[in-house]
Amino acid sequence: MTSNFFPYKEGTATFLIDPYVRVYPIAILMGMIISILTVAFFWRKEKFNFDHFFALLFIIIPSSIIGARLWFVFERLIYNPQNPFPGSAWYAIWEGGLSIQGGVALPAILSLVYIYFKRDYIDYRKALSMILPTVLIGQAIGRWGNFANHEVYGKIDPTGQSSLIFGEWLARHMFIYNANESAASAAFRYPLFLYESISSIIGYIIIVWIIQERNLLKPGSNGGLYFVYYGTVRLAMEPLREESYFYYSLAAMFSILIGGMMMIYFEIWANPSRYVKTKIGKFRYQYDWTKVVVDKKDKKIKFQSNNNKNKTEGKIKKYVTK
């Protein structure tokens, strides 16, 4: 049966327009665009200034690519220091080699720094909730770029049923041999990229379009939920990987820990009096950000809200402390 399948070498690229346009960068670009459009939807819903949105884009887009590549380079240097980039170079990003951990970590840190300095204009809790979970749809689409590059596959599947169940076309591209081996060693692999893509789509729908859209959790908690979800999925997939390192499992557990701490902080410890919670439908809520400002001239307390026109000063005073 396997004799009917052409063996693909690990890292062999699939072209949309041969030899100029690879599928890999197109998939990454599409994932970014849908993530950006999702954030824009919630940004407009919260009536945030789009000048800050475009400033964040200027930070996030390049830093996500740089961070993803740097993390990949770091991984290669750790696990194969003698020859980390066989037949390639550390900067050859067009040949694949992006790590989602770095693609999230670096832009998240830089975005938090920007939002901190603009905290009088952007509610950082809501920004975290609306930005971080949208990474899931970028991951889901980006995994198909990995598929096109014949990477992010699992261990050998002797029967090939894990791929054949999704059709012969997909199974053909899962008949792979490692870059440091001969074509004779080619075998069916578990379609790990597909499992991660499907799980990311499910997480995107639940976290973004059910929990976030309905404000079922307090502002900020969704950002933590992303880390918990991603870490859990990553940890569950680790046993299926061709090369499973303790480092990856440790990173996944750290992601779950950080996400859990964020959720506890925003749901329990963070000052709830900064928000006015309003039920606007069945299982649908609205959190209005409020802030106490003391006028320096007349020493009077003023109350600001991102949706002040829908709240009387009495209602705001009821929920806001000095």
Swiss-Prot record:
The record's listing under NCBIfam families reads: lgt
Question: Does the record's keyword annotation contain Transferase?
Answer: yes
Entry-linked InterPro entries: Lgt
Question: What's the protein's topology in the membrane?
Answer: Multi-pass membrane protein
Q: Give the EC class as a word.
A: transferase
Question: What are the protein's UniProt keywords?
Answer: Cell membrane, Membrane, Transferase, Transmembrane, Transmembrane helix
Q: Name the lineage.
A: Bacteria, Bacillati, Mycoplasmatota, Mycoplasmoidales, Metamycoplasmataceae
Name the principal localization, coarsely classed.
membrane
Q: What is this protein called?
A: Phosphatidylglycerol--prolipoprotein diacylglyceryl transferase
